[in-house]
Amino acid sequence: MTAGRAAVVEADGRIVVSDVEYADPGPGEVLVRLTATGLCHTDLGVLAGGIPFPTPGIIGHEGAGRVEKVGANVRGISPGDAVLLSFTSCGACAACASVHPAYCETWLPRNLLGGLRADGSGGISRDGEPVAGHFFGQSSFGTHAIADERSVVRVAGDADLTVLAPLGCGVLTGFGSMWNVLDPGPTDIVAVYGAGAVGLSAVIAASLREPVQLIAVDRVASRLDLALELGATAVVDASSEDVGARLAELTGGRGVSLGFDTTGHPGVARTALDAAAVRGTVLVCGAPPPGTEIGVDIQGILTGKILRGVTMGDADPRDLVPQLVALHAAGRLPLEKLEKRYALDDIESAVADMHAGTTVKPVIVS
């Protein structure tokens, strides 16, 4: 057992930083001493009750740190390795075998819902009582994480783990969605709806492909300014402008060939679909409550429009995360412009700032 501290989500939604104990890693697992963890909107979904994760429980799924212990049958990872943590998968189903682990047949229980390891056991306790963990195969809002081997990506020993922590989910999702799914080219008009961490990452990713237009849509002026700084060619302020009319004006009536809705809001998805060009595609991610529906005008999509969903950017973390690390090292992925750091004991302030829109990507330092 390893003693540590963690931010525990209670049944009433409060977050209580508590002393906890971590079991030794089992087969296919490693114990990571965390340096930092990014706060993601999926975490907020749990706190709001929209994602049914058991309580008391530990969430957090953008961990970064160094390996302390290695379980049986783990290959290629050793104590002392610097690592970034992402989502987990089974590695054996058809989706995993075809290098689409975000669509693993057991993705939901392994990452979101059960709070238990794949074998049904726990691993974290507080005052002798079990605490749910294994969120995205890690549960990283604490000093340590028991992480699945398949969620672990090794990085250079001198990597700045605090800066790189958000690569495991938010940035991965933005880049993966843009590069793996939408794949913009020089004749495309791209619109990104929502200028949070996922959306701004998508703006950076799209800008590297140099589409003819790259438009960011949001309600927060400071985020729109940041989108322009990161490569957007135009912005739309949804708090004061008619988004559909403004997009029609910006595109000369052509419409948006590639839209990416990062908000998880059905009204935004409908706006994006209405604004899409003939044979345009709208990609949707986000974590709305189960049962959330999008209203679609069937006549409006008969021009070949496509509405498509995506999870985790359809990315394999062990492939994309090293590319993102290299982009950051080359100065082409300015993560520092998105981040603000908070101590573990100040995690509720980080949550409040993210809700308010004053911080794009809070990073919790362990």
Identify the meaning behind each predicted range.
Residues 21-22, 54-60, 133-137, 143-144, ...:
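Short Gly/Pro-enriched turn/cap motifs at secondary-structure boundaries
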Residues 23-37, 47-97, 102, 154-158:
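Glycine-rich beta-strand-centered segment in the early N-terminal region that forms part
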Residues 31, 64, 83-84, 178, ...:
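Hydrophobic beta-strand signal
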